[in-house]
Amino acid sequence: ITPIACQCTFPESHPINHDKPLLNTKSPTYKHVLIPTDVPATEWPSKVELVPGSLISEFTSLKRESLDPMYPVMISNIQVQDPQGDVLVFPDNEWHDVPYVSKFMTGNLTPNGIPQKGIQNKNQYVFICGHAQRDIRCGLIAPELAKEFEHVLRHENLLYDKAKNPEGVKVGIVSHVGGHAYAGNVLYFDKE
């Protein structure tokens, strides 16, 4: 398999720190809520949670009153093919429709809540931070990384295809994750 050459050039004002160790640099989270959006990642504002009327805005505004700070919940927008609900929650690995955000948060995102059952996710996911308005390097490198992941997964017959491989790996873009020492941070979620 021939790798695709990355044609990215980053602004000199935004270098990548190649010396800082990556292992165990992410803060632990209790849950990660991923919210599909039709807005292309190239159009996401720097702070997606401040977009009035958006689902991520509603989740973010209720976080303090609905969640336990001892059990941190990360909330992100995603751009992904064929979402199966309003939100995808890990490590629960479930898609949910969320008619009442506050009720969903206290039931599904707290350790003592009474969760509503969702639809079991059947796919693995690779999400790449492509939030250009937050970090231009991510906006530049994410499309290249996505192409490479899709290229390799297609070659290995693992890439999602609605007709041919409905349980395949989906590759998508996620809003800002990680610090700014790196660019194009990659999240992998197994279906197990």
Q: Which ranges hold each PLM region?
A:
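Histidine/cysteine-enriched polar flanking segments
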Residues: 1-192
